[in-house]
């Protein structure tokens, strides 16, 4: 695919994905690559611009990430951020100093708005600093274009070579001019057009899938979640009836969810859809099991068995569709972060399944996946469907999973979601759900003492689920939810609201 490309070179900073998202907000395609990417690979990718991220290291550290000096002679504009700024200076024979005092938080910065980087900006504004080391002497050919009280070189440039460095973090909201500055780099320095869009992305993917698949058969494990749904629709638009979707209904879905998935994909999109009703099978395997990790493992393994059985019935299948998205690739593919997790999509399908993969969304962030879904005509409600764990309600019913507990959780959750929607909050809260702690408490209903279940409500705000804060839902909404659940759901006499952020808590209770 011919598209303008910006490379975000990863030095282990916490904001790497945010930098990439900021670039893409300007309709410019970018990829995150490790700092170990060779000069040859960079030349082959032919980027129009390069951004160095921040990172936790000092340029003087024994194992500090480095890049080859030749990178700065390729004629490609480079923007270094924080560690990336210091690394540029260090690599080009400037000087980096380690002071006793660090600079952290909101800081006033003086900007030289004659620089292309700060064009049309105020001379003084607010930025976000998070550093110890700083540049005490810029390399030959560079000049200082920003300062703070504590940092003599808050930004530098070699305009002739289109090399720029900033000590602050333009990608975060606290740098008030940050988005504008990145825009200046992309369009004033790199001279990009900004013509990458979700509609062009979908068209290109459909064309590529047609060419890749030919007349072969394809299967997709459809969960009804946003990622697998959008992936399935893209592939279906490319190859039509050559695609068969397998929807394993394990009986652990939310209220009416299985029927909704079947209706949308079978009726609206006219897909070949096999719905496997495996509720009894999954509940049988979960009987007597209360440990959350065992529950997850049992559900994952059983899902694989059911999927394999159905795939074999279809005969000669060449390709498997997965809803892998870009954060999955980044999290499993870079080697600079402190913690790396392996990526297992669709319940951890076995590696010995002899299918070639089709991953149409592997270049997109979640918000971009939603945008493609809207472009493809997937119902708005499904595109904005709440994140839902693979094991489903099994990990929202704490302790042993039974049909009775699932029914209670399902009804309470449906009421909570309904009232959030009525209040116009469904797209303002990242995730919200009801769960059933393994707790019963004393209550009074009428003139009788009761001893019934407690329902916990959980709602969080977040941008990426890595961290989250509890949602400040208006009291009147919580009051209505509480009254409705207690009155409409049997065996419930108490409602609690979880006011814990992540960390220390996780979003899910199990």
From Swiss-Prot:
Keywords: ATP-binding, Glutamine amidotransferase, GMP biosynthesis, Ligase, Nucleotide-binding, Purine biosynthesis
Catalysed reaction equations from the record: XMP + L-glutamine + ATP + H2O = GMP + L-glutamate + AMP + diphosphate + 2 H(+)
PROSITE patterns, per database record: GATASE_TYPE_1 (PS51273), GMPS_ATP_PPASE (PS51553)
Residues binding ATP, per UniProt: 223-229
Pathway assigned to this chain's UniProt record: Purine metabolism; GMP biosynthesis; GMP from XMP (L-Gln route): step 1/1
EC annotation from Swiss-Prot or TrEMBL: 6.3.5.2
UniProt name for this protein: GMP synthase [glutamine-hydrolyzing]
Species assigned in the record: Clostridium botulinum (strain Loch Maree / Type A3)
Gene assigned in the entry: guaA
């Amino acid at each position: 695919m011919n598209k303008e490309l910006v490379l975000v070179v990863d030095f282990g900073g916490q904001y790497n994905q945010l930098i990439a998202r900021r670039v893409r907000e300007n309709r410019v395609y970018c990829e995150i690559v490790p700092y170990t990417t060779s000069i040859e690979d960079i030349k082959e990718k032919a980027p129009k611009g390069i951004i160095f991220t921040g990172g936790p290291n000092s340029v003087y550290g024994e194992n500090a990430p480095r890049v080859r000096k030749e990178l700065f002679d390729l004629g490609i504009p480079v923007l270094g951020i924080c560690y990336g700024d210091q690394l540029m200076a260090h690599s080009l024979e400037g000087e980096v100093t380690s002071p006793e005092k660090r600079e952290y938080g909101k800081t006033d910065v003086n900007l030289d708005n004659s620089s292309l980087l700060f064009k049309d900006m105020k001379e003084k504004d607010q930025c976000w600093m998070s550093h110890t080391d700083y540049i005490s002497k810029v390399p030959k050919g560079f000049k200082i274009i920003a300062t703070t009280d504590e940092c003599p070189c808050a930004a530098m440039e070699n305009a002739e070579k289109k090399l720029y460095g900033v000590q602050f973090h333009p990608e975060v909201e606290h740098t008030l001019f940050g988005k504008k500055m990145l825009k200046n780099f992309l369009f004033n320095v790199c001279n990009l057009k900004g013509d990458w869009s979700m509609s062009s992305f979908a068209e290109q993917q459909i064309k590529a899938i047609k060419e890749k698949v030919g007349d072969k058969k394809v299967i997709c494990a459809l969960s009804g979640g946003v990622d697998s749904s959008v992936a399935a629709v893209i592939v279906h638009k490319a190859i039509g009836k050559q695609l068969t979707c397998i929807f394993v209904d394990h009986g652990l879905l939310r209220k009416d969810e299985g029927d909704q998935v079947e209706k949308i994909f079978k009726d609206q999109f006219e897909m070949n859809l096999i719905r496997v009703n495996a509720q009894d099978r999954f509940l049988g395997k979960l009987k007597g099991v209360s440990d959350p990790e065992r529950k997850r493992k049992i559900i994952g393994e059983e899902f694989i068995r059911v999927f394999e059985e159905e795939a074999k019935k279809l005969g000669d299948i060449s390709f498997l569709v997965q809803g892998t998205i870009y954060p999955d690739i980044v999290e499993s593919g870079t080697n600079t972060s402190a913690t790396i997790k392996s990526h297992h999509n669709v319940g951890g399908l076995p590696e010995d399944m002899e299918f070639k993969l089709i991953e149409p969304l592997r270049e997109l962030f979640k918000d971009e996946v939603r945008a493609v879904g809207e472009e493809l005509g997937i119902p708005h409600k499904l595109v904005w469907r709440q994140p839902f764990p693979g094991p489903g309600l099994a990990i929202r019913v704490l302790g042993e999973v039974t049909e009775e507990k699932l029914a209670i959780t399902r009804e309470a959750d449906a009421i909570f979601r309904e009232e959030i929607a009525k209040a116009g909050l469904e797209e303002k809260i990242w995730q919200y759900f009801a769960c059933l702690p393994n707790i019963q408490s004393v209550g009074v209903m009428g003139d009788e003492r009761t001893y019934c279940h407690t329902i916990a409500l959980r709602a969080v705000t977040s941008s990426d689920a890595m961290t989250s804060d509890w949602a400040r839902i208006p009291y009147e909404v919580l009051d209505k939810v509480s009254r409705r659940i207690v009155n409409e759901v049997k065996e419930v006499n108490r409602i609690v609201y979880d006011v814990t952020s992540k960390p220390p808590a996780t979003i899910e209770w199990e």
